[in-house]
Amino acid sequence: MILEKNNIIHPNDLKIINDLIIDKKISFVFQNNSVPIFKKKDFYFEHCIIERKEKINDKDRYKSIHCQNFLRVFSHVFSKFKIKEAEIYRAAINLTVNNSAKKCPIHYDHNYEHKQILIYLNDSDKNAKTVILNKKNKKLKEITPKKNKGILFDYLPHYHYFPKTGYRLVMVITFKEKEK
């Protein structure tokens, strides 16, 4: 399953997020490689909102001082995708730039079943696409970044191209949908 929705974040919340980023109230941390298990030197910058479930105990997972703003955004985004309740495994804003790498390696965000939502927070280089593959690494969908577009997909391998110009801002939410 792969679903796309435009205008996924409420305009007021999108303005709050953009203001936080533009006014430098959100810090980004240098990450040496986009997919740690590959040790490829394709750096990016990350603002961690909720740390990976497998990395740290539950009480210390909320990393962003703006977490409450983001939790409200997540709730709205989940409702747009008709997700009633979810356990979030990780949430972050990834900032990628031209780093001399063409693309990140094919990967899953976790080594266990999860769903994933990507939200483009800016109109970046149109060639900085996200590519979602099937379990045999055959292309299922190629998504062009567009500000405020959200993509929901199942536990599938994927990768993205790094922008050649400008920067690419993507909010990443991995989660498990709770039983109804």
Model regions and ranges:
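Catalytic core of non-heme Fe(II) oxygenases with the double-stranded beta-helix
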Residues: 61-180
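Non-heme Fe(II)/2-oxoglutarate
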Residues: 1-86
